[in-house]
Amino acid sequence: MKSVLGFKKAKVTEKISMVTCYDYTLAKIINSTDIDCILVGDSGGMVLLGKKNTTYTTLDDMQFMTQAVANGATDKFIVADLPFMSYRQSLETTMQAVMALIQSGAHAIKLEGSSGNLDIIKHIVDSGVPVMGHIGMTPQFINSFGGFKVQGRTEEAAKHLLEEAKLLEQAGCFGIVLECIPANIAKDITQNLDIPTIGIGAGSNTDGQILVLQDMLGMNTDFQPKFVKKYIDGSKLFSDAINTYVKETKANTFPTKEHCYDYC
């Protein structure tokens, strides 16, 4: 999948697979896999840089990560997050941020929420840049939500999510991330849209799934949300490998002859 058209076709043909990525090395690995799309998420501020939450991720951070991923994943469709407040100050500031991410190698951008964003989305799309929406648990609104909490658990909240999704579609979004909402609500939203939905903690009836790469590879031991499936215990694998290297170094069993250069 290398374009927005691929997303639209996948709505009726196959499930869409996405992961986050923030660096060149992992991007190169992903580039050799069957993954459909990469999201350079503002979550990289937390996962890669150790920041408290995504409100601390800057445009400079996003440019750095997007460039790294684009250099490594040359065959993948790349979406990059507009960071906190970069699209809530002025239209000029918004478009400068959009341009920065596209020129860093992204093919599309993603922003959170619908309120106050619809005209912005239309302008970005009219300017030739595809936009992905994001509703439900939107991390940039963590201070309003009072933490990372499931959204849409009441009838009124569920109705609001569906309304948001329809408005984002009408504004021109080519797809929408549904994060941390009940599976039945995500299914209802998906069935009422012509554009694909990508779920994260939203059940199996969305048009696709996305996970933070480090979560699914078992690299984050201090953050294990319910919706994450750990496909390998990466933290243990890496720790064991590093400890083996330390033991061999101290025992002088590394390097061996095969790792040394001969004198000519």
Curated annotation (Swiss-Prot):
How are cofactors bound according to the entry's free-text note? Binds 1 Mg(2+) ion per subunit.
The protein's annotated pathway: Cofactor biosynthesis; (R)-pantothenate biosynthesis; (R)-pantoate from 3-methyl-2-oxobutanoate: step 1/2
Active-site residues per Swiss-Prot or TrEMBL entry: 179
Cofactors needed by this protein, per the record, are: Mg(2+)
* Reaction(s) catalysed (UniProt annotation): 3-methyl-2-oxobutanoate + (6R)-5,10-methylene-5,6,7,8-tetrahydrofolate + H2O = 2-dehydropantoate + (6S)-5,6,7,8-tetrahydrofolate
BP terms from Gene Ontology: pantothenate biosynthetic process
Q: Which positions does UniProt annotate for 3-methyl-2-oxobutanoate binding?
A: 42-43, 81, 110
Q: Where is Mg(2+) bound in this sequence?
A: 42, 81, 112
Query: What InterPro entries does UniProt report for this protein, alphabetically?
Result: Pantoate_hydroxy_MeTrfase (IPR003700), Pyrv/PenolPyrv_kinase-like_dom (IPR015813), Pyrv_kinase-like_dom_sf (IPR040442)
Q: Does the keyword Magnesium apply?
A: yes
As for what it does, the entry says: Catalyzes the reversible reaction in which hydroxymethyl group from 5,10-methylenetetrahydrofolate is transferred onto alpha-ketoisovalerate to form ketopantoate.
- Its name, as the record gives it, is 3-methyl-2-oxobutanoate hydroxymethyltransferase
What is the gene name?
Answer: panB
